UniProtKB/Swiss-Prot annotation:
The gene is secB. This is Protein-export protein SecB. Its main location: cytoplasm. One of the proteins required for the normal export of preproteins out of the cell cytoplasm. It is a molecular chaperone that binds to a subset of precursor proteins, maintaining them in a translocation-competent state. It also specifically binds to its receptor SecA. It comes from Pseudomonas fluorescens (strain Pf0-1). Homotetramer, a dimer of dimers. One homotetramer interacts with 1 SecA dimer.
Length: 161
């Protein structure tokens, strides 16, 4: 019985573990440089989305992942608004090989954070009295694969700061 308990405990210690600890807004900004005049114009928006992720090792097996979404919306040639959110999360991640850890931090965690960031941006934009901002889902696995390929071609290796 004791051998079975020791084996189970040993397997539990080496089994991959993933746990979301906390999701929070790290930074938030909104600018509407042409208000109130922009509200009196015909609305024909052009949306430009920039996104970025970064990871940081914390103490032990904890990691912070930050997803930054920056949106610039132009109405004709004028900037209607600029909104940015840094949506962050703290994750407990244990017992993953280097490739799995890189994928988890570079694609899986940002995928978890995106709906929160999208909702925060939408709320911010509507509070600025603009129409709702409905951002399409993002394929973080594809973005991660592209970044991996770019890094391999340039001889870089993925790192966690």
């Amino acid at each position: 019985m004791t051998d079975q308990q020791n084996t189970a405990a040993s397997e539990e210690e080496t089994a991959p573990q993933f746990s979301l600890q906390r999701i929070y807004v790290r930074d938030l900004s909104f600018e509407a440089p042409k208000s109130p005049a922009i509200f009196r114009q015909q609305w024909d928006p052009a949306v430009a989305l920039d996104l970025n992720t970064r990871q940081k090792a914390l103490e032990g097996d904890f990691y912070e992942v930050v997803l930054t979404l920056s949106v610039t919306v132009k109405n004709g040639e004028e900037v209607a608004f600029i909104a940015e959110v840094q949506q962050a999360g703290i994750f407990l991640i244990k017992n993953l090989d280097a490739a799995s850890m890189s994928h988890t931090l570079g694609a899986f965690c940002p995928n978890i954070l995106f709906p929160y960031a999208r909702e925060t941006l939408d709320s911010l934009v509507t509070r600025g009295s603009f129409p709702a901002l409905m951002l399409a889902p993002v394929n973080f696995d594809a973005l991660y694969a592209q970044e991996l390929q770019r890094m391999q071609e340039s001889g870089e290796t993925p790192t966690v700061q």
